UniProtKB/Swiss-Prot annotation:
Keyword terms: Actin-binding, Allergen, Cytoplasm, Cytoskeleton, Disulfide bond, Phosphoprotein
Miscellaneous information on this protein: The variability of the residues taking part of IgE-binding epitopes might be responsible of the difference in cross-reactivity among olive pollen cultivars, and between distantly related pollen species, leading to a variable range of allergy reactions among atopic patients.
Pfam (any one): Profilin
Name this polypeptide is given: Profilin-1
Similarity comment: Belongs to the profilin family.
Species assigned in the record: Olea europaea (Common olive)
MF-aspect GO terms: actin monomer binding
Amino acid sequence: MSWQAYVDDHLMCDIEGPEDHRLTAAAIVGHDGSVWAQSATFPQFKPEEMNGIMTDFNEPGHLAPTGLHLGGTKYMVIQGEAGAVVRGKKGSGGITIKKTGQALVFGIYEEPVTPGQCNMVVERLGDYLLEQGL
């Protein structure tokens, strides 16, 4: 399966619930900042933004004072899982990032998608990739 298929079929898919909803944007990005696959709506990011995110995985709390920046959008960092998941909130939407052995799995959402739905979609794929040694 291509990396693009993982984004299209497992991240940008309909989310089960009272109504079917989808993430706003999603991507799989290598630890070095190279994009493996992304939705057409995923923001163009700067290398320093990706460096900050990687630093937060290695040094949990690094982004808390400044916020998480991606594509020029600032998210307030909220409770995640140290070294494994970073979560951010901005208005009625937010972001979930799951770290695997070689990549970061990104999901960006807006209402009516809930933070829990975004977490579920992103972390499910991230856990699968970890099980595959990726």
